[in-house]
């Protein structure tokens, strides 16, 4: 399926990006991403002040057992800004992180199986707060951003 740059909404963009990542990056690395439902919404937990510093939950993946649909639900925070290349890369990195959770239906948390998959697909750093390797950024630019454009969303600020 060919994806065209468009003025799509955020969820359509995430669906198209997930389709590209599922059939490309994850498949190439030997991982199967199940069907997921995607949305841009505030986290159900986190986003509070902890020891005087703000804690932002950038994404969440809910296991199928918590979803009446039986399909993993992935949420990306509207706090992130997709209006720049850097911002879109970060949003896509968070999406990749949440798709890693979906691969095993959130069974391994951020443990060893999660880390194996995450590092294979180009995530690095502390597994609870991964960042994108240069290799993953290059992959996302060429395979997701080139056909889809920037993520159609500007940062939403909260009080």
Language-model features and meaning:
Residues 2-86, 106-159:
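Metalloprotease/metallohydrolase-associated module, dominated by Zn2+-dependent proteases
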Residues 90-106:
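Active-site recognition of the HExxH zinc-binding catalytic motif
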């Amino acid at each position: 399926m060919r994806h065209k740059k468009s003025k799509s909404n955020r969820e359509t963009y995430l669906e198209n990006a997930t389709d590209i990542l599922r059939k490309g990056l994850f498949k190439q690395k030997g991982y199967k991403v199940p069907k997921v439902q995607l949305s841009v919404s505030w986290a159900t937990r986190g986003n509070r002040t902890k020891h005087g510093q703000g804690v932002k939950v950038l994404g969440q993946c809910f296991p199928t057992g918590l979803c009446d649909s039986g399909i993993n639900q992935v949420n990306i925070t509207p706090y992130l800004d997709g209006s720049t290349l850097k911002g879109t890369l970060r949003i896509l990195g968070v999406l990749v992180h949440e798709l890693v959770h979906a691969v095993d239906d959130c069974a391994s948390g951020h443990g060893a199986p999660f880390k194996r998959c995450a590092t294979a697909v180009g995530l690095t750093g502390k597994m609870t707060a991964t960042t994108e390797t240069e290799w993953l950024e290059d992959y996302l630019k060429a395979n997701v951003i080139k056909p889809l454009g920037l993520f159609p969303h500007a940062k939403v600020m909260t009080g």
